[in-house]
Amino acid sequence: MKDLLKFLKQQNKTEEFDAIRIGLASPDMVRSWSYGEVKKPETINYRTFKPERDGLFCARIFGPVKDYECLCGKYKRLKHRGVICEKCGVEVTLTKVRRDRMGHIDLASPVAHIWFLKSLPSRIGLMLDMTLRDIERVLYFESFVVTEPGMTTLERGQLLGEEEYLDALEEHGDEFEAKMGAEAVLDLLRELDLAQLIAEMREELPTINSETKRKKITKRLKLMESFHQSGNNPEWMIMTVLPVLPPDLRPLVPLDGGRFATSDLNDLYRRVINRNNRLKRLLDLAAPDIIVRNEKRMLQEAVDALLDNGRRGRAITGSNKRPLKSLADMIKGKQGRFRQNLLGKRVDYSGRSVITVGPTLKLHQCGLPKKMALELFKPFIYGKLERRGMATTIKAAKKMVEREMPEVWDVLDEVIREHPVLLNRAPTLHRLGIQAFEPVLIEGKAIHLHPLVCAAYNADFDGDQMAVHVPLTIEAQLEARALMMSTNNILSPANGEPIIVPSQDVVLGLYYMTRDRINAKGEGAIFKDPKEAEKAYRSGNADLHAIVKVRISQSVKNENGVVEDTITVIDTTVGRAILSLILPKGMPYESINQPLGKKQISGLINECYRRLGLKDTVMFADQIMYTGFHYAMKSGVSIGIDDLVIPPVKAQIIESAEAEVTEINQQFQSGLVTAGEKYNKVIDIWSRVNENLSREMMSNLSKDTVINAQGEEVEQASFNSVFMMADSGARGSAAQIRQLAGMRGLMARPDGSIIETPITANFREGLNVLQYFISTHGARKGLADTALKTANSGYLTRRLVDVAQDLVINEDDCGTEDGLTMKPLIEGGDVVEALRERVLGRVVAEDIVIPGTNTVLVERNIMLDEKLCDLLEEHSVDEVRVRSVITCDNDFGVCANCYGRDLARGHIINAGESVGVIAAQSIGEPGTQLTMRTFHIGGAASRASAENNVQVKTNGTLKLHNAKYVLNTDGKIAIISRSTEITIIDSYGREKERYKVPYGAVLTVQDNAEVQGNDIVATWDPHSHPIVLEHKSKVSFSDIDDSNTETQTDELTGLTRIVVKDLSKANAKEPKLIIESEERGLQETRLPSFTTIEVVDGTTVNPGDVLARIPQEGSKTRDITGGLPRVADLFEARKPKEPAILAEVTGTISFGKETKGKKRLVITPDEGDHYEEMIPKWRQLNVFEGERVSKGEVIADGPESPHDILRLRGVTHVANYIVNEVQEVYRLQGVKINDKHIETIIRQMLRKCTIMHGGDTDFLAGEQIEVARVNIANRDLEAQGKIPAKFEIQLMGITKASLATESFISAASFQETTRVLTDAAVNGKSDELRGLKENVIVGRLIPAGTGFSYHQERMARRKQRNVVEEQTVSAEEATQALTDALNADLSGNQ
């Protein structure tokens, strides 16, 4: 019998498959799947509850209802397996076959498949070159279509109404054929000769000039080719046989009380069968045409509803007015098959409970309630009890566990030992949301969680719940221990910094114990070692904060990695000496010889990890936590109302501000300032007051004045509780203390605008009713925002994961020499991100040399770690070319060198790591911290935009970049280019500051001059845009008269100026200046509305002089989109509303003939055709007639469109743009994300390209294809010496990129399921199952992480299999083996 079971198991082995293909099913294929035709709409007999014969649940077709038992009960038991009962016709087999045996319905009249008809673009319509409207009229029996014109004047595919048809019949008789309904469409599709049509269209394409026609033909050609190549037949889009789903997948379940719950599909099938049978009868009876037609139409509608209810017309509803769920609804949406059952499954062996603090746990432990553990580990306990002989059977073991006998607890202890469990807190936003711990049994019902992992889980103990899962198999336990254990996840995968960081109480305790206090007990003592200091503290002879000397022996690794022991006497405090007792060997004492705030502790753990490795760090982190909790308790830091000290100058500050505001209000009433100016000024005043007040308050709080041992007055940091909490980073911030002890400040309305009356009171003084009302007004918006934000952030994460899920490290080095150039990010006078932060953990793309020499500092292909980064800083290197994911040459993944360091582990990344998902999670997880608001610029922000000079902060050399300039009459530099930047270089050649300088700015110093800090080096007028002369020229006026200009006289100086009127109102000519110079000849400059002319007609003007000034208003008051919506816009690659206009080619600017409301901009390159573009007149251009621009330069200001940047400046520029813009949003919120995560997403956005020219490939011009596929095809062609295809890389938004992925399974499970599947079926697509998602859906290990090697082995096996024939068992051999086994067994048991 054992052999028999072995044999059965062998037969049940799943096939290894490498791809899944989807296509159209031919009628023959549907019949081959089927086990019989369903002829009746009956389901089951309501008395016997047995399935009706030939009905929707028929046992003869679909299989028996009970295992190994036929319907009438003649054959029962296993011995009759395979017998077909002659009485009821049922095969004796497992009832499980009712899940996979299909039936079919022979349709009396063909029916169009609604997906290929209505899913846009309509495939049937494209095939026949008819509009959807026309085809629907034929299908739903409204008009005839000519299927065979014969010798008549009619055309094939022509539509005829009822009247026209009768007329044509009279005229031509039987010479032509016209039909209606799906039969007609079927005939038309049959007639198509694909090969011939394709050849004709390929010939016709090059001759077509009209763009729309070419697009249409290309579309049709692509569809025909995909049908031709995939072996699909167009006529299969019309169904003549309808498959019937196996009955157990659309069950009929008896409820109590004799009623039945049924799947909606049964109703839909019954409807189809009823109508089909009725149609058959009508056809047999030869009923009148109009009745038959109506019945056929109803059949078509019934099948439509079965396949996709509601796609056409009103959805068919059931008895309860709810639309029935059709086959299409089963698979799409959040509740569909993909997202509900395949990608998100429920798990057994899990429990959930509230969490509470476990301050005594070690980092790898969690407290598990006994009751919960008993339930979760039941099977293990049963097995152990039985093996021990404590229970004879499983049933007995069950009883023991239910009674909770004492032995059970001992067994539970053993079972749990070394068996990790997974803890998960929803929402799981990144991979640290699930970690493994060793359970420790505890009394009570709450799970105990180690405080240090709270940051990773984003958990707090205000009622959060967590789920526990038990890994069952030995492989799962191994992975949990080796990869998911909390001790292995010390660094955050998003930025490589420690995520196991103390917070709140622990920070406060450590901060308190490392502070120093003047005049503390025991000051000036000297201790022989930290232990003695601790003894003094314990015995009460020395205070924790006393400044003392301690002899410290430390062993620190030097440069060569040798451990040296040193003994020194160090000035420190008692508390720090005590803390040094838990400092691991090899860490320098300096690292704790300072007051430790949150930042310092984080740095301490980071340094420990880099110096000493994982094990020491974990133990140190635990010790830090215990110590921190202990001393937080000792400190007795608490908060009382007297700790909130209100600065005495508050009343005076507010009084003076109110006086200023009153003055502005008076000015407003006398009409000196506008309402807008008044609003901005008032808000400016209050913002300034708020800042001053909070500065006063903090300085008041943070310092105490004491008299030291020498009798002098000195200041020391305060021991005020509130200040200590904020200063240490434990809780609270200056902004919150300001509201408690300063003033509440300005409040926002729900629409984000600021209310101009501030709340001058603080919370200690208390608010009056009006103030309270103002503060609630904006606060409610905050709550509504949070809910919105969470949903939006979740959706962004989902889209990111979807686009990046199949990006996996799949080789060590792709060998590319390409990369990105990294420089420090400098904005104004501040280094926003230093070079070391940008290149740490990256692989060098080309040798780094010491600046100014040829000495190689770091060779290419070496990863920059902390030591090498220190080296770069020593030699003041400020530009490094590093490898990047974006430039990686790998076709279907990324190589380890282009990715660099695995941030969560600190070494170069392993093969098989799924970097795409990590990137998506790292960007999506902090999404909830971003704001949702679009900022309205006003007040302080508008003040910043009115900068009018550059004031440098440091000493150094001034350098100009991309500058075109002329020297004016004073010999100063006047800038005449757009994208000029000034940088300040220090004595080592490092860039320290970088400023943008506008057109028309005047420099006060020359290029390469030495400048001092606080020097003003450039000035300009912020309110107007000057037109500056390049050469000495004669200027004359043209079209300037009273109709379009007016003369204004300045009252103070008495000077008169000519100002252009508003040209958009009157139909005036546009005034021009004619400029005549030796260098350029005649040029004309047009003057827009409101321009002030600064010169007199007919005078000669020097270079650098200003001809005219164009006012700069209006463009500055745009809203800035910030926060989450901005990030989403960038990743969706959306075009901005009014994008900047960039120069398409390099050349000279001129203006052509104008049209109504548009200017014609012409750029003439040195050779080749000129380029023209129409630009709205109101757009302010940055260029003038005759100016040279280079390709990609900004012509009109505005937000730049990433598509333009890619097209005109290339891949690296667009990558830099998106990275910097995304980082700016996150930086504002203080979130650190490594650049390479954003680059990873950008790589996925750039994976498609448009074919410009097909070369010798099969690609059509204008086709969109994966870059990888084009590269592979081109490599093959180049090897054969043929012409490769030319292509242009496209930037795609993440949603579009996810839907355009090669894998149709992945795309279908993301969005627009119907469209994706229709498309894939028509193209006969194969899914190679490369990504993670597809493999999860088909239920395999994913090709990443530990599954990576499994898939590599599978591929290797497949290669072998192509050589060696696999051993298979034929049906005859199988039956023989079975009979032998059964006979042997029977004879043995006699």
UniProtKB/Swiss-Prot annotation:
Mg(2+) binds at D460, D462, D464. Its EC number is 2.7.7.6. GO terms for molecular function: DNA binding; DNA-directed RNA polymerase activity; magnesium ion binding; zinc ion binding. Zn(2+) 2 binds at C814, C888, C895, C898. SMART domains: RPOLA_N (SM00663). The keyword Metal-binding applies. Keywords: DNA-directed RNA polymerase, Magnesium, Metal-binding, Nucleotidyltransferase, Transcription, Transferase, Zinc. GO terms for biological process: DNA-templated transcription. InterPro entries: DNA-dir_RpoC_beta_prime, DNA-dir_RpoC_beta_prime_bact, RNA_pol_asu, RNA_pol_N, RNA_pol_Rpb1_1, RNA_pol_Rpb1_3, RNA_pol_Rpb1_3_sf, RNA_pol_Rpb1_4. It comes from the Bacteria. SUPFAM superfamilies: beta and beta-prime subunits of DNA dependent RNA-polymerase (SSF64484). Disulfide bonds: none annotated. One of its GO terms (cellular component) is DNA-directed RNA polymerase complex. Zn(2+) 1 binds at C70, C72, C85, C88. It catalyses: RNA(n) + a ribonucleoside 5'-triphosphate = RNA(n+1) + diphosphate. HAMAP family: RNApol_bact_RpoC. The RNAP catalytic core consists of 2 alpha, 1 beta, 1 beta' and 1 omega subunit. When a sigma factor is associated with the core the holoenzyme is formed, which can initiate transcription. DNA-dependent RNA polymerase catalyzes the transcription of DNA into RNA using the four ribonucleoside triphosphates as substrates. Belongs to the RNA polymerase beta' chain family. This is DNA-directed RNA polymerase subunit beta'. It comes from Pseudoalteromonas translucida (strain TAC 125).
